[in-house]
UniProtKB/Swiss-Prot annotation:
GO terms for molecular function: ATP binding; nicotinate-nucleotide adenylyltransferase activity. The keyword ATP-binding applies. This is Probable nicotinate-nucleotide adenylyltransferase. Its EC number is 2.7.7.18. The gene is nadD.
Length: 213
């Protein structure tokens, strides 16, 4: 396996959880743990991005975010990675395509919050994402209606897997997606930065009981 890339066995189901993690926080941990349980995943890879093309201002340096993410997300079935920096990709569709070439016998599931589903139609090649890998959507209370009524949700409504069958998502053939409600930790990276940078986030270092997107 290439240096900087996690190991995966053929046939494994890997959840891909991408984001700037600027900073990582207990909400990210909570979502990751819920995704592992709900979607029948063997592992989850955090994809700490070099930058987010939908954000006007760049995040903190990648090495700082990687260090903080590894301190925050401690779980034997979760890998914190900077895969996109090694691949040179900047958009999700390209990252997924590259990973499928590198790991041809691994099954990937893209994980996202309902807030991201609501704006998925703005992502470059967003249809390619849904038609390439199953998508698991984890919703907190305030994001549910806008996500369910989003252009992406309406366009792919026939391919939605019922929440009661969510554990089958990892073995489904794309296009397939599943929308589940999860109790959320009331924290966000945006609010942490607005409250004074990363100092508040560092108070949660080492927590493993919760996670979010």
């Amino acid at each position: 396996m290439r240096q900087g890339f996690p190991y995966a066995r053929p046939g494994q189901v890997i959840g891909l959880f991408g984001g700037s993690f600027d900073p990582p926080h207990a909400g990210h941990v909570h979502v990751t743990r819920e995704a592992l349980k709900m979607f029948g995943l063997d592992r989850v890879w955090w994809l700490v991005t070099p930058g987010n093309p939908l954000k006007a201002h760049g995040p903190a340096p990648l090495d700082r975010r990687m260090e903080a993410a590894r301190a925050m997300m401690r779980h034997p079935r979760v890998d914190v990675t900077d895969i996109e920096a090694h691949l040179g990709t900047r958009v999700t569709a390209d990252t997924i395509a590259a990973l499928r070439r590198i790991y041809p016998r691994v099954r990937f599931v893209w994980l996202m919050g309902a807030d991201n589903l609501a704006q998925l139609h703005r992502w470059k090649d967003w249809r390619q994402i849904i038609e390439t890998v199953p998508v698991g959507v984890l919703a907190r209370p305030g994001d549910r209606i806008s996500a369910r009524m989003s252009p992406a949700a309406r366009a792919y409504a026939p391919y939605r897997i019922d929440g009661q069958a969510r554990h089958l998502l990892g073995r489904a053939e794309a296009p397939a997606w599943c929308f589940v409600n999860v109790p959320m930790v009331d924290v966000s990276s945006t609010r942490i930065r607005a409250a004074g940078g990363w100092s508040a986030a560092q108070q949660g270092r080492g927590q493993t009981g919760t996670q979010d997107q």
